[in-house]
From Swiss-Prot:
Inhibited by Cu(2+) or Zn(2+) and to a lesser extent Ni(2+) ions. PANTHER family: ALPHA-(1,3)-FUCOSYLTRANSFERASE C-RELATED. Can also use Co(2+) or Ca(2+) in vitro. GO terms for molecular function: 3-galactosyl-N-acetylglucosaminide 4-alpha-L-fucosyltransferase activity; alpha-(1->3)-fucosyltransferase activity; fucosyltransferase activity; glycoprotein 3-alpha-L-fucosyltransferase activity; metal ion binding. Optimum temperature is 23 degrees Celsius. No detectable activity at 37 degrees Celsius. Keywords: Glycoprotein, Glycosyltransferase, Golgi apparatus, Magnesium, Manganese, Membrane, Metal-binding, Signal-anchor, Transferase, Transmembrane, Transmembrane helix. This is Alpha-(1,3)-fucosyltransferase fut-1. The keyword Membrane applies. Belongs to the glycosyltransferase 10 family. It comes from the Eukaryota. The chain crosses the membrane at residues 13-32. It is a single-pass type II membrane protein.
Amino acid sequence: MTARSIKLFFARWKYLMFACCITYLLVIYAPISKSEQKDWKEGEIELSNDHELDVPILQKEELKPQQRPSFEENVPKKKTFNFNPVGKEPFDVEEVLTSSDIKLEERMTATVIPGQKRLILSWNAGHSQDNLQGCPDWNCEFTQVRARAPDADAVLIAHMDNDFVPKPNQYVVYFSQESPANSGIQIPRPDYINMTLGFRHDTPAGSPYGYTVKLGAKSRKTGQVVDANLVNGKAKGAAWFVSHCQTNSKREDFVKKLQKHLQIDIYGGCGPMKCARGDSKCDTMLDTDYHFYVTFENSICEDYVTEKLWKSGYQNTIIPLVLKRKLVEPFVPPNSFIAIDDFKSVKEMGDYLNYLMNNKTAYMEYFEWRHDYKVVFLDGSHHDVLERPWGFCQVCRMAWTEPRQKVLIPNWDAYWRQTCEKDGTLVDSIPLD
């Protein structure tokens, strides 16, 4: 369009354009009538009620940084307990990994009456007052004097003795750290025993060989948690320390099959290699030479996890190999072990283990748990706060409950004898290829 055409356009339509502008301004700036205001407000209220909207309008002063709500402050902090074991570094504990419903706070607290004591009698299970050193402030006395049985709050038995007759309101505690496949007790009636003191977690007096804690925030670790140079120096496959050669689980059969795909050095009475018990060099070579440690149990029973896993498997820089995932997973750190039932065949497992040996980055991922968790090994010879949440201290705690907490194993056979797999069930189910 030329300049002349534009000039003619405005000359012809200028009055109409001026009128349109005036009309527009009147519409925009003219005041709303009272009836219109009422209609508008009613519509707003109706909308608010229909949708239940209640949105506060923040003034400028409410937006100042120091007045903004802190979401971290609103999240309740979990209570932690400080563990200060003898001769070791103290650490804060947020929770213990267990299948039991008894929380850590309950485990760590006893309602003690000043000036009074509670009595624990070992009828034929051994032990001594030293086993209560994890909770000396709970005022429990340990005795092996059978004449004091009528006064005992709890009585430990390792096998039946007809001379012992339980009293009402008295806990009968069965002590055993052996697999149900290799141990047992003949009892006069199915509900004779109140609780067990041993590897089982589903009992108030559970006393495993070790346990895992989730660390409190102050005790968690940052940065590198494993020595990369140590891992890079490893060259061998797996080590196995074993003296029980024929077992219910048939673990020896699986190891023989796996040896076709992975180097497994067998130490002890069941293999050609020797390493004396208690020799520190044995632990050192697990750190420096081997990638994996065989922790297969002699039988597959509920909660049955022994010192093989807790000591050599987790106190060294090595990945433990276990038989069945569901038996150990509730009690150990996440992504910290390898189970044979994770694989479709023996060969598939061997291939994966060889892959980890050749991929140190993937191998080291199995130690990431050390940032947030700690594994405690209970060797049975040192008694301190590490034992407080378990075993004898928990029998002591139960003895202080008022009214006396009712605990009962209603069917002993179902609880003990019927919790093991038939011999070789798992091993026989895994094909070679």
